[in-house]
């Protein structure tokens, strides 16, 4: 089952983009693929990168408020970036970052938080895959033991060791403690270090600037796409990049593995809808998952090439039809994500699902694929659960 991941706005090539891709691919292989009856190494993943054709700012967004302050960051190296993501994870959330206290309140949620923190620093797909396998063991243990006795006497120094020990002791298979335990301890360290920063004015300022930048680039990427998407005979660069990946994924189908699934984040959903309704309606999808997307909003504004002002004739009671080439369509949103929208009120044959990323409104839009539990839920939906 080839999977095509279509990224959204505000993605530009660099270390953070490549680390996010590696982490995402690792969790898709180790959590989603087995649920679909595939061996992890057999899963073909296509990730068309269209960000290079997105908006460019002549003055580097100098029009944003307080440009003289510069764009503060948590640091230029990878670990500082990972810590910044964890600060965003904790800011305005119910978690405190004090892992033992959090575990005593909600052990399964704390396990997910710990692995999200570890995943934030994954540097390769292999490391992400190891984390994903370990997460599945620990998540299963947490589901069966939501209030384990050992948490009452655990300390921040031994929490990761005890979690790793009890999770593996409950399974016949062990994935090895060495590298995983180190990654978990790094994740726990990020939580401890991020906890004080998550409540400071500096964190709020940084996250607001991040949101401001995201919204600005969202508008810019959207305007560029709409102005340059091209025609069916001469598609623009963004459409062509995604279309080529879809056709390559179609060609990768075999008689024994003939399914094709597309995961589209944010504006990737709008690109996919234009492709499926205008540029190439012949592309057959067994599953389409739009995440934090605005597909319904853009149809309400009638901005697609296939949009018709008189269809449906009786909104809001009426709906438009799901593209016939899509067998199943799941639309995932977080009420904290200010850039995510429902789709059921506009399109027939679509299932809306709410997912709580655990992030505040300042960071939720990019948070879905940072949470290990998101892949677990996705696997369950795709496998019919």
Feature locations, PLM:
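Serine-dependent carboxylesterase/thioesterase catalytic core
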Residues: 2-30, 67, 219-329
């Amino acid at each position: 089952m080839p999977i095509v991941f279509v990224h959204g706005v505000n993605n530009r090539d660099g270390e953070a983009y490549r680390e996010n891709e590696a982490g995402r691919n690792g969790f898709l292989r180790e959590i989603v693929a087995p649920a679909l009856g595939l061996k992890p190494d057999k899963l073909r993943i296509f990730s068309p990168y269209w960000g290079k054709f997105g908006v460019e700012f002549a003055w580097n967004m100098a029009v944003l408020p307080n440009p003289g302050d510069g764009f503060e960051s948590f640091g230029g190296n990878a670990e500082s970036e990972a810590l910044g993501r964890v600060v965003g994870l904790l800011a305005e959330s119910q978690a405190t970052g004090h892992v033992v206290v959090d575990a005593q309140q909600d052990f399964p949620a704390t396990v997910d938080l710990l692995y999200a923190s570890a995943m934030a620093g994954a540097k390769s797909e292999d490391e992400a895959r190891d984390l994903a396998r370990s997460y599945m063991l620990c998540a299963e243990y947490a589901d069966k033991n939501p209030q384990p006795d050992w948490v009452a006497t655990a300390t921040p120094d031994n929490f990761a060791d005890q979690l790793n020990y009890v999770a593996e002791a409950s399974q016949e298979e062990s994935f090895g403690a060495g590298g995983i335990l180190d990654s978990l301890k790094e994740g726990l360290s990020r939580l401890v270090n991020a906890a004080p920063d998550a409540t400071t004015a500096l964190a709020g300022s940084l996250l607001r600037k991040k949101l401001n930048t995201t919204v600005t680039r969202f508008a810019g990427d959207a305007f560029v796409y709409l102005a340059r998407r091209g025609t069916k005979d001469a598609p623009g660069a963004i459409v062509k990049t995604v279309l080529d990946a879809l056709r390559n994924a179609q060609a990768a189908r075999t008689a024994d593995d003939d399914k094709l699934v597309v995961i589209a984040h944010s504006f990737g959903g709008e690109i996919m809808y234009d492709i499926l309704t205008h540029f190439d309606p012949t592309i057959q999808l067994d599953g389409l998952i739009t995440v934090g997307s605005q597909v319904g909003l853009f149809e309400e504004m009638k901005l697609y090439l296939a949009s018709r002002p008189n269809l449906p004739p009786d909104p809001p009671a009426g709906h438009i039809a799901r593209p016939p080439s899509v067998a199943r369509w799941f639309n995932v949103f977080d009420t904290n994500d200010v850039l995510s929208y429902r789709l059921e009120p506009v399109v027939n044959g679509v299932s809306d699902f709410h997912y709580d990323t655990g992030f505040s409104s300042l960071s939720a839009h990019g948070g879905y694929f940072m949470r290990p539990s998101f892949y677990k839920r996705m696997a369950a939906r795709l496998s019919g659960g």
